[in-house]
């Protein structure tokens, strides 16, 4: 078999069956076993949840980088570049490494047909092993119990972020059912960090933790988050003993994500004998330096244009709360592109009170809701105007309303399309530093 180019490797991997068609960690477990268990010499932090997984991952990796712990980060989906999924110390994997590892994996006979997600996870862990990573922050793709990442074994720390209604056709239609799937990553011997949850979800998580004899449980309680303020494009807050923390990440929901990352980092650093004084410095600097594209990210300040990957009811509720807090009394132009299997009616309802108008887009995905249908749904509410966005060129700074802010949201895939368009038009490629 001739060696594939970078583009051919991606084409081969991305055309494998998607993880949603065959849930389960068995294939990934088989692959990793055949590859010599590349994860065995690194400490893993495993993260599940409906919202906030990527942000918590980014915060954690930034903190561990400050501590001098070489850390791999595995997330999905990517926004613009496939390589965003696989990073070490904030740097994306190179095209050459993707090509080399991709060729090796595609030539291997695993005795079954891996999904795209199986291949991505295997590539990530091989890369982290080659780079001699001491730690890996691994984000689940879908759920937890049947997710490919559950093949990694027992993580040192497990984190479960906010649980809400998403992927209900696969995970279940009630919070306790969804929580049971997420709780599938909680294993005997791990240490557990939880974000605050609705009672039905929290009960399931705590019952699972008790059943699995989890050695330590910490809960990121928002009552411990104080002195929050927004100033000059940055947020400041205090959490427990950490006073006046600074972060570039925007949104009120990021306070809780940062708190969860702090608790997980405390456990991880303490396990390595790092003093509280040093740990506080690493945490403070790591939180301050974290960047995470596509999450309340400002692409233009004058005129103002922000993109946010909120793609379910809870995520859009957090976006709405953040906009009210950061820009009190203002109304916004919204640009929306969603998947047809999402609860887009709830998403619309959350933002209608803040809307001047909506423009809708058909996302480039077979799962996308048509822009015309979405526009008609908004129009039928009778609250504000709704129309179609005919070209991303309408979102360029020279075409935006200077008097009011414009916010694009609804899907990470949609945000990725906008990010790529901005890069292509401005010819500015963002630094390969992810966080």
Each model region followed by its residue ranges:
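ATP-dependent carboxylate-amine ligase
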Residues: 2-4, 153-154, 267, 311-435
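Nucleotide phosphate-binding/pyrophosphate-handling subdomain across enzymes
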Residues: 41, 130-131, 135-140, 146-159, ...
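Membrane-proximal helix-turn-helix segments that form the acceptor-binding/catalytic region
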Residues: 179-187
